[in-house]
């Protein structure tokens, strides 16, 4: 970022007292602005200890602390905390005063927490096997987080009509989870927030020394965090909230866009509203596209995101191709950081296989490869092993054998009876276990299961290592072993994600024509990747929030899955995957697309399916929402890529005045804002 502040930044830095709301677009230099503001407050006589700065996560808190220390050139700096760490401090005070019961803090990284969650899950879902699908545990944890964010107790969840269509298993498991915490005198960070708010309500002197409170990423706060901020604010406190309603993408875990979209101004009288509408991250073409998409939401767009002259001339490309490996092979990506982002985990699994096929390095943003934990991968791998070798010899001593066998058993459609699944998994995990005898003994007297096992036997050793993997997949489909994928899922979204995973892998195998042995090696024994370029970072769009890369590839841009359902959708699994999302869900998904494309600095690649309608939209330079259901996601239509490229070129070529009549009213608005900013 340039050292000179824009006039928008200067007005925030010089704000004196009183409540303020700062609406900041992606990459607008808000951290620099807030550091300068705090620096000014301290230099004009404000006691640093009377300033509280609340950051959304630990990494942001650490980064801001270092920058503020450098700016103030002092070890005495304001209190900079996450909501969780402040809550922990307040809870510690409550324990010392013997107002609340003393408990141990348990964090997600603690092995006891993992055991506790699994124990609660087994209770709620009557789950017998020792191994539990990590994706199912993640869904359960998200449900817990959503309940905690709104201070919903198990009794509330069981009796509140708004929870009537939630799967009962989740509520039973949640109840057991809360009991286990209490029985073991444990509390989580989410519990700390709830208890801290209760303490603040009962003791108004807590936090009374804070005269300035700054809250970053306010669009991501939930009800408990919002209440905490209000209770810390006294009559002489100035609260400044900073955020962007267009980046509120965590509603499914308790965030509320209305806190920044209107409630803040209602709760804090005489709030002064500031804008940070100038981005330092990407060029005009991408700014125009981001504005074009997000204006379709019901939240009134009063200021556009406008690119600063110092930003790179970001290049946007569209690829009409379902084969990611072809796109990766043809990309002339310049040097720099690079990421592949997706709405769903299924597409990340597809991307991982494509990257392995191309010999390109990669790593997941959060954690290691999850390919082996996907149940559709389990049944495909076992299906190919049986089709080629007739047994599971290649899985012997493989580190991921249990996860792969679990996936196979989960998706094979055996209609497990009580106790069978656990016995089958244990039997197949034994050294040199024979699948046919292990399952055959288990299915004695169960005709459907015996018939199912017999159908599986018909594919044995029908193919060789050189047989195209797509042919083996076709055989599995013909025998009915792919139809059941996703049918045992705990959540509707999880089930749909697994089904889409099969579709993505079908597309990759069909286009690449790799043989069965190559497919098995890609999954079980991937080769060494190239070392002459930065690894691709794989992340969901939700996980990419707050980050940026030089080059970004967006995949999974199909209308059928984006807009999709909530990531932690815990409603009935049998609901049709084609149920159209509600308008408010579409708006959250549109914000998610907006967040995704604005992670880019230099080059954005959008991988879309073949769609004649989109081709027509681009040819005519349209940017409207299609009335008929499209093939590619509606958000790519709304982005109006060709129209934005046309206007962007005019700006960079200094031909705006000559071509003014060719620009839409919306793009003329952008040009006026660009001129008005005088950046």
Model regions and ranges:
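Conserved RecA-like helicase ATPase core segment
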Residues: 226-316
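C-terminal accessory regions
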Residues: 516, 530, 558-679
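Accessory C-terminal helicase-associated subdomains
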Residues: 394-395, 399, 433-543, 547-549, ...
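P-loop NTPase Walker
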Residues: 1-98, 288-291, 598
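ATP-hydrolysis module of ASCE/P-loop NTPase motor domains
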Residues: 78, 96-173, 178-184, 408-416
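Conserved helicase NTPase motor core
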Residues: 2-14, 18-23, 111-112, 164-262, ...
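ATPase/helicase motor core of nucleic-acid motors
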Residues: 266, 334-466
């Amino acid at each position: 970022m340039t050292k000179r502040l824009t006039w928008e930044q200067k007005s925030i830095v010089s704000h004196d007292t009183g409540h303020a709301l700062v609406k900041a677009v992606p990459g607008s230099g808000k951290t620099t602005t807030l550091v300068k503001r705090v620096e000014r407050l301290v230099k004009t006589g404000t006691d640093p200890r009377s300033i509280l700065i609340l950051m959304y996560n630990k990494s942001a808190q650490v980064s801001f602390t270092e920058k503020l220390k450098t700016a103030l050139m002092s070890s005495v700096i304001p209190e900079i905390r996450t909501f969780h760490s402040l809550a922990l401090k307040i809870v510690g005070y409550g324990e010392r005063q013997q107002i609340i019961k003393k408990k141990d803090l348990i964090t997600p990284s603690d092995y006891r927490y993992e055991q506790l969650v699994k124990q609660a899950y087994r209770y709620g879902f009557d789950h017998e096997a020792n191994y539990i699908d990590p994706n199912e545990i993640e869904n359960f944890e998200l449900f817990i987080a959503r309940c905690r964010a709104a201070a919903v107790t198990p009794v509330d969840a069981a009796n509140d009509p708004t929870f009537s269509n939630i799967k009962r298993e989740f509520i039973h498991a949640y109840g057991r989870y809360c009991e286990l915490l209490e029985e073991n005198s444990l509390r989580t960070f989410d519990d700390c927030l709830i208890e801290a708010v209760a303490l603040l309500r009962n003791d108004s002197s807590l936090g009374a020394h804070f005269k300035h409170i700054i809250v970053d990423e306010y669009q991501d706060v939930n009800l408990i965090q919002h209440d905490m901020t209000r209770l810390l604010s006294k009559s002489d406190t100035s609260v400044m909230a900073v955020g962007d309603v267009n980046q509120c993408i965590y509603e499914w875990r308790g965030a509320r866009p209305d806190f920044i979209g209107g409630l803040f101004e209602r709760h804090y009288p005489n709030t002064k509203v500031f804008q940070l509408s100038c981005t330092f991250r990407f060029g005009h073409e991408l700014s125009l596209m981001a504005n074009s998409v997000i204006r379709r939401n019901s939240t009134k767009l009063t200021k556009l995101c406008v690119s600063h002259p110092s930003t790179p001339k970001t290049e946007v490309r569209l690829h009409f191709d379902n084969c990611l490996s072809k796109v990766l092979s043809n990309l002339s990506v310049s040097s720099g950081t690079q990421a592949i982002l997706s709405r769903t985990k299924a597409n990340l699994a597809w991307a991982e296989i494509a990257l392995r096929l191309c010999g390109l390095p990669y790593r997941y943003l959060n954690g290691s490869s999850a390919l082996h934990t996907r149940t559709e991968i389990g049944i495909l791998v076992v299906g190919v092993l049986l089709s080629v070798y007739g047994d599971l010899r290649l899985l012997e001593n493989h580190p991921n054998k249990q996860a792969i066998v679990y996936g196979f058993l989960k998706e094979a459609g055996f209609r497990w009876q009580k106790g069978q699944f656990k016995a089958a998994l244990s039997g197949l995990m034994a050294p040199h276990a024979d699948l046919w005898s292990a399952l055959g003994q288990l299915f004695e007297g169960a005709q459907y299961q015996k018939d199912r096992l017999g159908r599986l036997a018909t594919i044995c050793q029908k193919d060789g290592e050189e047989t195209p993997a797509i042919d083996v997949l076709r055989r599995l489909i013909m025998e009915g072993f792919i139809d059941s994928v996703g049918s045992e899922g705990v959540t509707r979204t999880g089930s749909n994600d697994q089904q889409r995973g099969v579709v993505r892998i079908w597309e990759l195998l069909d286009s690449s024509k790799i043989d069965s042995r190559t497919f098995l090696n890609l999954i079980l024994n991937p080769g060494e990747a190239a070392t002459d370029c930065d690894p691709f970072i794989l992340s969901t769009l939700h996980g990419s929030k707050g980050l940026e890369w030089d080059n970004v590839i967006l995949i999974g841009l199909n209308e059928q899955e984006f807009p999709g359902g909530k990531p932690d959708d815990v409603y009935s699994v049998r609901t049709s995957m084609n149920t159209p999302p509600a308008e408010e869900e579409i708006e959250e998904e549109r914000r998610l697309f907006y967040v995704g494309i604005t992670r880019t600095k230099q080059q954005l690649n959008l991988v879309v399916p073949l769609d004649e309608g989109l081709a027509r939209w681009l040819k005519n330079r349209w940017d409207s929402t299609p009335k008929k259901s499209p093939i590619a996601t509606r958000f790519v239509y709304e982005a109006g890529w060709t129209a934005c490229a046309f206007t962007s070129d005019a700006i960079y070529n200094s031909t705006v005045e000559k071509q003014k009549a060719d620009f839409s009213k919306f793009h003329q608005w952008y040009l006026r804002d660009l001129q008005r900013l005088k950046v």
